[in-house]
């Protein structure tokens, strides 16, 4: 099973869905819902950079997938009135790949590197002087005849995005002047996002319908927008085209997304811990084998939301299903763990 197979995964279902997602993304901070602390700070930092007519300081954005790191990077570029170049850590295989991007930037432009924790060490070393001194050190030739030349770069803003801030090396992390963590969204903020997206798509939707999707979206805008598109399909084919609470509930139940936003993989993981390992603790290797899933997928995709919502604990001895997990499935809570 791969993440893209899940309706509530954080990858895009299709190229069309990705195009729609980009179309409904907010373009400016005024349209950016939720993350109030991030929005407030970025407004100040951007205005200060504009007053000084400087490039914004380098920005690191981290947090779980689907919370809007790419959206925020594009908003920063729009607010600064500059262009943005987008790439990702795995794509930058050689130092020359990075050099080609840096030398084509205009003054104060934004270079956005997604999955920046996956940069190769050699490429990362080239990035250090570029970030710190706006200079590019290039080696010409090989062996004893090799020599280093320096190329001046225009001032620019590097925006790095990662779901694994702890995987960044200290030298790279320390070169970011601004660090922002994106948190899971509140239900009210997600409801506003769903309503805004529905308006962008020209859909008829009642507030209760938006609330139903927000409650099942796992605190994640990307999932909320995906649920909206699938509920729209259901409303147009089975209903009268209007997304009300009842229509949203029936559509989401049909899609096997329950009231807590769990799908069959979430339930499979929790029930495996409860039924096969007596509630835990269970090690990651055993859990992965029990549910037939990759360890990285469990750690990066399945567990974060379950832990954040209090259904799962990650301890030194292994994973433990909490009392809340037992209650979710209508099971008796064991007397002793």
Swiss-Prot record:
Q: GO cellular component annotations, sorted alphabetically?
A: cytoplasm; Holliday junction resolvase complex
Q: Where is this region: Small ATPAse domain (RuvB-S)?
A: 186-256
What EC number(s) are associated with this protein in UniProt? 3.6.4.-
* Entry binding sites for Mg(2+): 70
Superkingdom assignment = Bacteria
Cite the InterPro entries for this sequence: AAA+_ATPase (IPR003593), AAA_lid_4 (IPR041445), DNA_helicase_Holl-junc_RuvB (IPR004605), P-loop_NTPase (IPR027417), RuvB-like_N (IPR008824), RuvB_C (IPR008823), WH-like_DNA-bd_sf (IPR036388), WH_DNA-bd_sf (IPR036390)
Reaction(s) catalysed by this chain, per the record, are: ATP + H2O = ADP + phosphate + H(+)
Which residues does the annotated region (Large ATPase domain (RuvB-L)) include? 4-185
GO biological-process terms attached to the record? DNA recombination; DNA repair
Region (Head domain (RuvB-H)), start-end ranges: 259-337
Q: Which UniProt keywords apply?
A: ATP-binding, Cytoplasm, DNA damage, DNA recombination, DNA repair, DNA-binding, Hydrolase, Nucleotide-binding
Function of the protein: The RuvA-RuvB-RuvC complex processes Holliday junction (HJ) DNA during genetic recombination and DNA repair, while the RuvA-RuvB complex plays an important role in the rescue of blocked DNA replication forks via replication fork reversal (RFR). RuvA specifically binds to HJ cruciform DNA, conferring on it an open structure. The RuvB hexamer acts as an ATP-dependent pump, pulling dsDNA into and through the RuvAB complex. RuvB forms 2 homohexamers on either side of HJ DNA bound by 1 or 2 RuvA tetramers; 4 subunits per hexamer contact DNA at a time.
PANTHER family annotated for this entry? HOLLIDAY JUNCTION BRANCH MIGRATION COMPLEX SUBUNIT RUVB, PTHR42848
Entry domain remark: Has 3 domains, the large (RuvB-L) and small ATPase (RuvB-S) domains and the C-terminal head (RuvB-H) domain. The head domain binds DNA, while the ATPase domains jointly bind ATP, ADP or are empty depending on the state of the subunit in the translocation cycle. During a single DNA translocation step the structure of each domain remains the same, but their relative positions change.
Q: Would you tell me the protein name for this molecule?
A: Holliday junction branch migration complex subunit RuvB
Q: Which gene encodes it?
A: ruvB
